[in-house]
UniProtKB/Swiss-Prot annotation:
Organism classification: Eukaryota, Metazoa, Chordata, Craniata, Vertebrata
Keyword Membrane: yes
Identification of the protein by name: Tissue factor
Major localisation: membrane
Source species of the chain: Cavia porcellus (Guinea pig)
Similarity comment: family membership: Belongs to the tissue factor family.
Gene behind the chain: F3
Length: 289
């Protein structure tokens, strides 16, 4: 494969041995002499297509400008004369996440205008968001356990990638290439079972009357690296027990009230009967033999 002919600065890049110790020494010397410090350790940080370029060192007497390009485009400046050591390049990649990008960090003196001969810069590694962005932690949107069927729905994660002004979800971008793995087990055991789907929904057979725990993981099998996401939060079914507990909070007090009412009613009736018998005895004539 032919290496893309990336746009270049009109002056040669100064070679620096990429070691942390030498980099620190050069930073101190450059800072003392008022020379722009050459950036190093350029690293891409990307999750669900939110992409940030990071580098070192923190500036002393210099500022940074970040540029980005593709093999077929000129360099475009994004972050101008900043003192931070990171630049968010998401918006530049969002319209075409399958393109391969190259960035460079240019170090300048604070009062420099334009790209002068004393500016120094470093190129980033090439980066293709579609292949290299990390998959974020998925979220279980809903679940339902009915009889012997467990239905689990995974939330369709939205990203900052877009097409025709519309933001895309992971499913929009990867289609059937995005799969989810469900790990599930009876809450009373530890042995896990798995199920795979290329949609966002699972419907699996389970044992009736048992509670289950489960989590999901996003997977892109076609990738060489970064195939799997972190595991989602583990959740467990408690639907039937939950309903029983909710009903008990209502039914038990009602039953107690009914029992009290019945007891009071019986007590009142008993008192009335006793009073009636007492009145009858007092009104009867004496019987003298």
């Amino acid at each position: 494969m032919t290496t893309p002919a990336w746009p270049r600065l009109p002056h040669p890049e100064i070679a620096v041995v990429p070691t942390l110790l030498l980099g620190w020494v050069l930073v101190q010397v450059a800072g003392a002499e008022g020379i722009p410090v050459k950036p190093y350790n350029l690293t891409w940080k990307s999750t669900n297509f939110k992409t940030i370029l990071e580098w070192e060192p923190k500036p002393i007497n210099n500022v940074y400008t970040v540029q980005i390009s593709t093999a077929l485009e000129d360099w475009k400046s994004i972050c101008f004369s900043i003192t931070a050591t990171e630049c968010d390049l998401t918006s530049e990649m969002a319209p075409n996440v399958q393109q391969t990008y190259l960035a460079r960090v240019i170090s300048l003196l604070p009062n420099s205008t334009g790209f002068l001969e004393d500016a120094v810069y470093s190129n980033s590694p090439e980066f293709t968001p579609y292949q290299e962005t990390n998959l974020g932690q998925p979220k279980i949107e809903s679940f339902k356990l009915v009889g012997t069927k467990l239905n689990v729905t995974v939330r369709d994660t939205q990203t900052l990638a877009r097409s025709n002004g519309t933001f895309l979800s992971l499913r929009d971008i990867f289609g059937k290439n995005l799969q989810y793995m469900l790990y599930y087990w009876r809450s009373s055991t530890t042995g896990k079972k798995t199920a795979m789907t290329n949609t966002n929904e699972f419907l699996i057979d389970v044992d009736k009357g048992q509670d289950y725990c489960f989590f999901v993981q996003a997977v892109i099998p076609s990738r060489k690296d970064n195939k799997k996401s972190p595991e989602s939060i583990t959740v467990c079914t408690r639907l039937e027990k939950g309903k029983f507990r909710e009903m008990s909070f209502i039914v038990v007090p009602v039953i107690l009230v009914i029992i009290v009412v019945i007891a009071l009613f019986l007590l009142v009736c008993k008192c009335r009967k006793a009073k009636a018998r007492q009145s009858g005895k007092e009104g009867s004539p004496l019987n003298i033999a």
